[in-house]
Amino acid sequence: MDYIIELIKYIILGIIQGVTEIFPVSSSGHLVLFSNLFLGGEDINATLTLFLMITNMGSFLALLIYYFKDVKELVVDSFNFVFNKEKRKEIIVQENISYAVKLIIAIVPIGIAGLLIKDYLPTNLLSIGISLIITSLLLFLVFLLRNKKFSNDITFKNAGVIGLIQMFAVFPGISRSGITLVGGLSQKIEIKKVMRFSFLCYLLISIPVSGLGLYDAIKNPGTMSDIPGFSLAFIFSFIFSLLTIKIMHKYVTVKNLIWFSLYALTVGLVSITLYII
């Protein structure tokens, strides 16, 4: 019975990761909060850190499937631009290589920030709560722009600004998808375009992160303490990420970002309250 309860915990963690990775409410913040509520307040140790990477891989696979056509076009046209002189002249190839470069520009800052400071960031309930409240305030500020016209395409300057803002997502509790929405919408870029750009950034970022996670698993096989549990979390993270991205693209608008703002505020206050008591 105890082991079944443990497996249920893994399933819940996978669902939390799948939903909160896509919605702008911070998956890292929710998973830290969950570990405190259901795992007896344990710190995020090597095993849990690896677990977070595995559930992230579930989200990665879901987004890769959802955006497979876009990813395929970007990869193929990038190779065509480099190796095929005739294809290089085609407008669509030039547009796709330009978009790929913008994605790279946008992920460089968070990559550097992650390497330099990620190991030194606090992951207690107080810091998580504060970060979630910051996420809430940023989403609310963008909500105030709901009556503005959003029509701009993403330029190299836009990508740079989004990248600099996205850098702050290394702080647990700051939603990466949320802060990229803020970065894009504040530059009057249409929300569907920002979402596509944001999640393609996530796919690029996840490749080295997942690679490091697999390396750590091979290097420290003891951290893979519960393969069935990890597998369940991966599966449920994948399923719920795929469901949530479909909901996100179909229903999320600038006007209803207020609900995510209120939700992040509520969870942030709960996190701070739990820290105090």
Curated annotation (Swiss-Prot):
GO MF annotations, alphabetized: undecaprenyl-diphosphatase activity
Name of the protein this chain belongs to: Undecaprenyl-diphosphatase
GO CC terms: plasma membrane
Reported function: Catalyzes the dephosphorylation of undecaprenyl diphosphate (UPP). Confers resistance to bacitracin.
Extra remark: Bacitracin is thought to be involved in the inhibition of peptidoglycan synthesis by sequestering undecaprenyl diphosphate, thereby reducing the pool of lipid carrier available.
UniProt-listed PANTHER family: UNDECAPRENYL-DIPHOSPHATASE
Catalytic class of the enzyme: hydrolase
Residue ranges crossing the lipid bilayer per the database entry: 3-23, 48-68, 97-117, 125-145, 198-218, 227-247, 257-277
An annotated GO BP: response to antibiotic
